[in-house]
């Protein structure tokens, strides 16, 4: 149970941001930190904490959280309870930059107020939040002013986003971590890019560039400067919550490719590595060396995992085999219980049902250390 000082700190941070304070449940989540051996996470009292949960990136109809959290708040509450009942202790939410910034230097106070209510919901439900920011998942919803910014101005706006979000959440133990951006990438050395968003997947732009051109700089230096800029914005108002970046493990695609943001020389201000792993049938064993290569003296969270290119059985075998290298696992939940997927006997629905059933069945095994 979080101590009285932590309860007061969370209330003060919220009140200072100008938002109403909601009472916290007695069983609300406590603070999480990196363990002393730098391989995993622990509670304040030293008990091991294994992040085990879901990406709550969209609902069953493909709508993003901000599309329905105002008119359908009861749905969000129900989904959080269902994720908890399936065994989750962490929920990863994906905040869209266009919903939290009204302009380059103007946070949206209504969105911040709703975020604080979501943190309170997590507290009441007994869940931690991984708050991933700067999303531009629906290309049509990205503000024209944001798309038009040059690199320096875009980074400044991103810093405004993170300072506002972190300011609302500072002092609240239910927040497990801040993830600066989902799958940031950089252009090639001699290949300036024409747009900030990479190709879509399933109608969504999950991958985003942090620069359109290196202009003679090293990719490593650009990545390092970006991490320092955004973590600096967070640390100006919040010195305690963990910070990470959701990284594509390029070694899964290109043999010998090395980590970028997981490299301590580049992602020095980050507290742990977060990678997205989708094992392929026949190549399951290939993921383990890549996973270990991302550790580099810090915990590695598998922040995205799903049987996209393998069976649920194969995925389960990989997850068990990765226990010595991974500090936690976050899959996906899209607003339906496992039995609801039986109503439509499509291959995709059967795969999702199998995943959710595996997740629930594996909960005791994967969260005990």
Where are these regions (language model features)?
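Hydrophobic h-region of N-terminal signal peptides that target proteins for export
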Residues: 11-21
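Conserved alpha/beta catalytic core and glycan-binding cleft of carbohydrate-active enzymes
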Residues: 287-290, 305
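Surface-exposed substrate-engagement region within the catalytic domains
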Residues: 289-300, 311-325
């Amino acid at each position: 149970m979080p101590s009285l000082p932590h309860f007061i700190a969370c209330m003060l941070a919220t009140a200072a941001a100008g938002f109403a304070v909601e009472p916290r449940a007695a069983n609300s989540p406590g603070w999480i930190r990196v363990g002393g051996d730098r391989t995993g996470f622990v509670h304040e009292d030293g008990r091991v904490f294994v992040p085990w949960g879901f990406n709550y990136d969209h609902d069953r109809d493909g709508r993003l959280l901000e599309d329905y959290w105002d008119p359908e708040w009861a749905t969000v509450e129900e989904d959080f309870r269902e994720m908890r009942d399936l065994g989750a202790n962490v929920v990863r939410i994906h905040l869209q930059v266009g919903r939290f910034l009204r302009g380059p230097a103007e946070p949206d106070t209504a969105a911040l107020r709703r975020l604080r209510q979501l943190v309170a919901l997590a507290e009441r439900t007994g869940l931690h939040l991984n708050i991933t920011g700067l999303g531009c998942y629906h290309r049509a919803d990205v503000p024209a002013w944001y798309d038009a910014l040059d690199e320096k101005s875009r980074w400044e706006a991103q810093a405004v986003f993170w300072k506002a979000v972190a300011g609302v959440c500072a002092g609240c133990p239910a927040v497990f971590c801040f993830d600066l951006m989902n799958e940031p990438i950089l252009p090639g050395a001699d290949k300036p890019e024409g747009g900030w968003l990479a190709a879509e997947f399933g109608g969504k732009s999950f991958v985003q560039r942090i620069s359109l051109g290196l202009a003679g700089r090293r990719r490593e230096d650009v990545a390092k400067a970006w991490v320092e800029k955004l973590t600096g914005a967070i640390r100006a108002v919040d010195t305690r919550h963990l910070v990470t970046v959701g990284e594509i493990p390029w070694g899964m695609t290109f043999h010998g490719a090395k980590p970028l943001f997981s490299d301590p020389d580049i992602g020095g201000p980050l507290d742990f590595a977060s990678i997205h792993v989708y094992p392929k049938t026949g190549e399951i064993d290939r993921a383990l060396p890549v996973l270990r290569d991302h550790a580099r003296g810090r915990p590695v969270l598998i922040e995205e995992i799903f049987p996209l290119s393998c069976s649920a059985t194969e995925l389960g075998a990989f997850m068990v085999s990765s226990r010595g290298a991974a500090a936690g696992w976050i899959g996906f939940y899209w607003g339906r219980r496992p039995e609801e997927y039986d109503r439509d006997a499509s291959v995709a629905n059967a795969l999702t049902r199998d995943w959710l059933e595996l997740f629930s069945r594996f909960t005791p095994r994967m969260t005990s250390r």
